[in-house]
Amino acid sequence: MTDIQRIAKKITWVLFITQSLASAGFIAAAAINPILGAKLASDRSLATLPVAVYLLSGAFSASAWGYIMDRIGRRNAIVSGLVLGILGNALVLVAIESASFLLVLIGLMLMGITNSAVQLGRFAAAEVNPPNQRGRAISAVVLGGVIGTVLSRVLAVPVSNFAVSIGMDELAGAYLTTLALFAIGAVIVFVGLRPDPRDVGREVAELYPELIPHGEARPISQILREPAAITAVTAMALGQVVMVAIMVITSLHMEDHQHTRSDIYSVISAHTFGMFAPSIISGWLLDKWGRGKMILFGAFILLLACIAAPLSPDVLPLGIALFLLGLGWNFCFVGGSTLLSDQLSPVERSRTQGANDFLVGLASAFISLSSGFIFAASNYTVIAIVAGVISLIPLFMVLFWMRKKPLPVVG
């Protein structure tokens, strides 16, 4: 094993651990955010506004993080993002105690910025690995969400009980958990993410010359006119839209059917397990079979999830449907991320990937806010129908792209 390979392995492991801790925090908060919104908002239709603000802030900060990562490095940028998340969680805790809906929005805005920084870590893992291992590297980082799923489920109820025991609201437990996990993650990144992936990625680019030229960076507008890039961004953006549309409202749907908090955590955990556990094989499948087939399969699974979700309000059927929702998202997300990374030179990656995450976040923020209004005016079934129709767009678009210009298998 060469020095570069050892460094790449170490960086991937550090990013995996960071993703595990951060995901546990985000998942713990995600199950509670709509419930907290419904509790503090003056209008029930605004229940998902905190989630929309969270997603929107992540979207608008994604491009900025791309520039920041190029300027100060991946390590310093991710640490800065986690510190903002710690502050955001502290504000939400104050908001719960003071019943301030505005403070909740500000706190979740900061947490959205944190999520944007952490999510770009998957591209840092890709850039330090050779082209034929990038799918597996991205999957390895995304796989940290499996640990996050288990960790959030294990901590959720005990920490909520602890919050109550010290005189805090039960809902505060999720944000206490997230604050602590972000703090641990920040220390691990600051100490362990050395040398910086930005610098390692430049060395890897010299060792593994690619078809994409290494000279002057193309404008983002030009890159996003390429068929493969359009396909990748569409898969990620609309896969995220379908997932968010159903996931964000499921907690409220279950509360309306008198489910316990433990039931809600179980269903959300099944969903996040579906999001992250398939990364064990999805990266290998991407590198072996090609990006397009996996994205196509993911879009089809999303459609199945949309059909299954409204069939029953019971925990088991909902858990299965939400697991499928996460599985379809995983294939679209990892497949799209890898396909996009394939199209970019080292000098184009951070900014283009930041722009991609902006588009993905913007789309998911819009559907998050829309879901609140749709749910208040109708029901869960209508949301599932809307999401199902949207899932057809990437399905047919990827199929068309594969027929017109199939991407050669990497490796």
Where are these regions (language model features)?
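Juxtamembrane intracellular "pre-TM" segments in multi-pass secondary transporters
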Residues: M1-K9, R194-A232
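C-terminal ends and interior cores of transmembrane alpha-helices
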Residues: V83-S98, I301-P313
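Helix-to-loop junctions at the C-terminal end of transmembrane segments
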Residues: S61-G73, P278-R291, F375
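Helix-loop-helix hairpin linking two adjacent transmembrane segments in secondary transporters
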Residues: L103, P131, V141-V191
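Cytoplasmic helix-loop-helix junction between adjacent transmembrane helices
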Residues: L108-G144
